Amino acid sequence: FFNLALATLNPGDEAIIPAPYWVSYPDMVLVAEGKPVIIETGAETRFKITPEQLENAITERTRLFVINSPSNPSGMAYTLEELQAIGEVLKKHPNIMIATDDMYEPILWTGKPFCNILNATPELYD
């Protein structure tokens, strides 16, 4: 993620980071002279960002969206349907790059196959 932020963010560009998040994500954005936009989540959404939260956070300066599933530190994992709904929002904003952090795929214990946002919404690949 660090190299991606350095390569793609210009001063003042925004990176949307759902909370809770890996501790260094915002700092990496700051080193790249970007602005971290933290979206708070809670127990009511099982610590997952909703499509509505994402849509409301997007501005003309948004260039990067970080999604980590299974998440560190919460351990939650997005479902295929949740990722498809988030993907529908992102399809409307082709200038936003997606950083999908799949580091914890091996500890997915839901009994369902692993799925990331690009598996759920392949149109986002380009």
Language model region names:
Residues 1, 21-25:
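Conserved coil-to-alpha-helix start sites within the AMP-binding
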Residues 1-14:
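Phosphate-binding glycine-rich loop
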